[in-house]
């Protein structure tokens, strides 16, 4: 893609998200969502093939439907209260429709079906943007309207997302689909705690973006898109095999890695609110995610694909400069659990 066009598209994507995040007027929020959606579609179609076109079309239809529901909720609320302000969402029907629209944009169950299909059909770089940056705008609006959200509806969607994110990834061999199901599960954890402690949702989001970005960068460095290609990683870049192992386990939420921090804090916060059954279900379903990450870990570092002797020295010709950006990301996504008690005290 032409660098000038790519720069324009990226600027529009960023601008659309920032408009949503900084607006207190529903019409501006809707405009920001539309700008963001229309700008990211060419990024999804960077590779000119039928699969990427199909993925972009699915993304467009889903996001357009969500935008229609969002505008319907805004108009219902306007008829009820006469207000365009985001904080003035008092109509229960409008609140319910708004929650459906935003969860559809996020990819929460039962509106999650588009996430694995779209992620699988696009390049790794576009998948990274889709699963990280594109979550910021809907989560910001959910954060803003959290006092007026139907608690039962959101918790049901969240628990379903955690369970589906775990079950869906079990049989997958495509790394992009696995990351998509992981995203669904992480969104479930974030929206569960949104009602009780919105600040913790933001902390969870930052950690999720760090871990997901690190994982996608590792996949792009080793050109891996399937579990089979992960077994070739030790030939190409043996130095990052151990790093990949730690990052995968961190993404699965295994202590003492960074990924355990949000789960620990969320379970503790729910328990403080005398909610015992909910964190128990969440902790059990989180084991499903950990299981398929353990499978990836096994494929990455504990198996060796049959190769010739010439293949075994291929890593010597790789350019180590590409790994320079990965270093701080790896440290942050695996080794930031120790400050957790201090964060809990400050919170």
Swiss-Prot record:
Keyword RNA-binding: no
Keywords: Electron transport, Membrane, Mitochondrion, Mitochondrion inner membrane, NAD, Respiratory chain, Translocase, Transmembrane, Transmembrane helix, Transport, Ubiquinone
GO molecular function per UniProt: NADH dehydrogenase (ubiquinone) activity
Membrane disposition: Multi-pass membrane protein
Enzyme class, first EC level, given as a word: translocase
Domain of life: Eukaryota
One GO biological process term: mitochondrial electron transport, NADH to ubiquinone
Catalytic activity from the UniProt record: a ubiquinone + NADH + 5 H(+)(in) = a ubiquinol + NAD(+) + 4 H(+)(out)
UniProt KW Transport keyword: yes
E.C. number(s) listed in UniProt: 7.1.1.2
GO cellular component, as recorded: mitochondrial inner membrane
Regions annotated as coiled coil: none
Places the protein is found: Mitochondrion inner membrane
Residue ranges of the TM segments: 13-33, 59-79, 96-116, 122-142, 149-169, 178-198, 200-220, 240-260, 276-296, 325-345
InterPro entries: Complex_I_Subunit_2, NADH_DH_su2_C, NADH_UbQ_OxRdtase_chain2, ND/Mrp_TM
Principal place of residence: mitochondrion
One Pfam family this sequence matches: Proton_antipo_M
Primary role: Core subunit of the mitochondrial membrane respiratory chain NADH dehydrogenase (Complex I) which catalyzes electron transfer from NADH through the respiratory chain, using ubiquinone as an electron acceptor. Essential for the catalytic activity and assembly of complex I.
Family from the record: Belongs to the complex I subunit 2 family.
Assembly, per entry: Core subunit of respiratory chain NADH dehydrogenase (Complex I) which is composed of 45 different subunits. Interacts with TMEM242.
Annotated protein name in UniProt: NADH-ubiquinone oxidoreductase chain 2
